[in-house]
Amino acid sequence: MSKKAEAWMKKRGWTPQRFQCDAWNALGAQRQGIVNALTGSGKTYSILLPYLFDLHQSKSKSPLQCIWITPIKALAKEIQSAAQRVIDECQLPIRVGIRTGDTEGKERQRQQKAWPNILITTPESLHLIFCKKKNTDIWSALQLLVVDEWHELMGSKRGVQMELALAHLRHLRPQVLVWGISATIGNLHEALHVLLGPAHAAKGELIQSSIIKRTEVIPIQPDKPERMPWAGHLGIHLLPKLLPILRESQSTLIFTNVRSQCEIWYRSLMEAAPDLAGTTAIHHGSISKEIRDWVESSLHAGKLHCVICTSSLDLGVDFAPVETIVQIGGPKGIARFMQRAGRSGHSPDGKSRIYFLPTHSLELIECAALQLGLQQGELEKREPYIQCFDVLIQWLVTLGCGDGFRPEDVLESIRATHCYQHIQDDEFLWCLNFAAAKGTSLHEYPEYHKIQPIDGLWLVNNQRIARRHRMSIGTIVSDTLVAVRMRGAGLLGHIEESFIAQLHEGDAFWFAGMSVELMELKELTAKVKKSKRTDGRSPVWLGGSLPLTSKMSHLIRQKIEEASESAPTPSQDPIIQFIRPIFNLQAERSHIPNTREMLIEQFESEDGYHTMFYPFEGKFVHEGLAALIAHRIGEQKPMSFSIATNDYGFELLSNKVIEVHADLVRHWFRVDHLERDLLAGVNGAELAGRQFRDIATIAGLLFKGYPGQPIRDRHLQSSAQLLFRVFQDYDVDNLLIRQSYNELVYRQFDILRMRDALDRILSAEIIITRPDRPTPFAFPILVDRLRERMSSESLKERIAQMTIAWTS
């Protein structure tokens, strides 16, 4: 097997890597597992070549022999090109097809008449095939299942979708081989276990590349740190420093963490350097497929000089011409940063160069922490989901839409997954009955009777239910989307209803890198025209924040310790030396904590009495901690608080002085009754109800409407709230309610990480200072609180006033 693949690679002037040879040999021996290697090192060919040269059987009774799963549609084209390159050069009798949400209807029909030998698809599109009648015949010659970018899927419910699909196909075709491809992940052995399932994981192969890719991280800094705002606006003030880098590079990807940042940066870049307009583009998941395709192909052809993007270009789409990567703001995790850095030097021996542009000066600490993390070579884990009853209910209806199922067969199949390996008989029976609306509070409503037993086979026997289910398959839940159509130019993309509903006809806003004016909003279609106005708003999407990983939190605390009074020697890190004036001011007014200390500051301003806590655990954990501590303080002495958080700490603002001393702090941060007090502090029922909306959508309780007739977001929300109250009051054993609280506690607030943080704080020395004015650590948190209730212009004025008053 290796000889054929090796000969083809040598013909192209490539040298096979050791991990590629190991993968070829493993497939030749009919083994399965995960290939783990860096971006651009040849992971795709490590699995693809063995199939093309040896595993493919030209005389098979069914053409479909290999399914290649990708988490993003953009990657499908690249995989198809990689396969087609070999097929054309070697004249192999193999057909490759793509089936995603973007595939045209005619192509889908052609595929159903004659399936390709290799089908490249997404988890959702694969599940749609399971909805087809007689779909069992499609898999009759299946030999190979490949899950690309497995690290992206594993920590999400899309990963659970894949677990169910893999277990089902294995049940139908026990001899099928399963392989995962992963670039960057910390818990590889667990990833292998989740991919292959408990029965096969022990014999799975973990093939890792020994290639160490050089990564150069370069911070973009102002001339003096005093010129950098302590709580800036997206780093735009450093644009003059970025422009020379863009002009010197042949091609650049500028990564932002969220789509709204992406739009603002494109707009700012065009205003600052209009000469770049013809060679600069924008790319994110809400822009239309046509625009994204054009950007990708133009970048690949070397026609674009710069692309501002989000994680939509994180993954392995092969853009070899990319020379430089820029990261705007902290990426919040080492693995994500490495993934993005790997987009440059996208070849096994290429060197990655990534510039770090901070949005405010303290964020430079993240750059120093990332450099340390890259040196240590440790990556974050992806925590897999377990007991996702919403996904299981959707899966039962999917099987019912297709060839039907027998419960005993499905139970055996799902127990072969990591997610459901410990599911109890009564839990499975509850899900089965819930999908049939048996014995539940929904029994009187026909639309919830989705499946029913017919001669021992459970089926969907209603075409309307089947059609609505096919339209709802998936686990990605977002706000209702509004199509944005340009007059005379077609679809630009989609914006969430919650943003567009705030606009009036004639208002300007920025989208897809251009200023447009809203002409009409009708039936969730926004008709727009080009506008010359530059004062339009930038859209905001829900879910627009990334949590700081626990590993990054630990590294940040280490770098801060280097600047503390307890550091044995002055830090030699150039970044720490550069922002030394800020640390000096922090030390002068308060204290710089080491890793064995917990800093608390108290001061008074015209807004009230501020108590600042600095665990350095990330914004998501701080939101939970702030609510927890506020609740526990309020139990002792009733008072109201305003809460603000960022990645470094949180603020409790009150109209009364809070008594603070070390014993009280340890009482507030105690671990006992953590879940009870947390849910009380955050109004757990209210937040669990919001979590329930997503769960109810996945489980098929909420239907978002037909094409052209979408159901508005507020109606979906009210329906979800009604169902939540009904289940809580009349269905005490409802597993979806239980799941809502579990996801709130274990996912949103990450109670396990919070418990670790509490343990660390309890063992730390409590340092309490009372500065006469806010400190550099406090200032960004204060600004975040003001940002919630002030316009951007008013906020800029207030920041300027505060900076003058508090730095004098």
Predicted segment positions?
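Helicase motor core with emphasis on the C-terminal RecA-like subdomain
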Residues: 1-11, 15-21, 25-41, 46-403, ...
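A conserved acidic, glycine/proline-rich C-terminal tail/linker
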Residues: 489-508
